[in-house]
Amino acid sequence: MKFNEYYENLNPEIKEYFKIISPHFPKFLIPFIESKTLMRLKDVSYFCGAINASSKVYNFKYDISRLDHSISCALHVWNFTYNDILTLAALFHDATTPALSHVVDYLNGDYLNQESTELNLEEYVKTYDPELFNYFKRIGVNI
């Protein structure tokens, strides 16, 4: 999926939130956002399954994807640092987490650190997204 298609279908409130975080959207992020690794996150809920729980306990206005969350983290970092590498680190911080990851972390006894489901990013990208891996190498960024 291309970034423009993702953005056109984005909830207007999330679009506004992105603009509040960083009035300038760093265009260098677009090829990374369009990668298989990150586009996968558009279908992974940020709420780790809580969106499907009782509406008496949770009353979310709408769902937010892990991709939305990752972009917002990158925009926060960009707004304060204007550092490409730190911004990419923020963008990719959830790249390898599976759906319901924090639920599985809890089942794994890792409810404090919530890292048991995270895979090594370099190995993940090398294996599942060689195009992105080669792009990182081409621009001289170590994962």
Describe each region flagged by the PLM.
Residues 1-143:
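Metal-dependent phosphohydrolase cores
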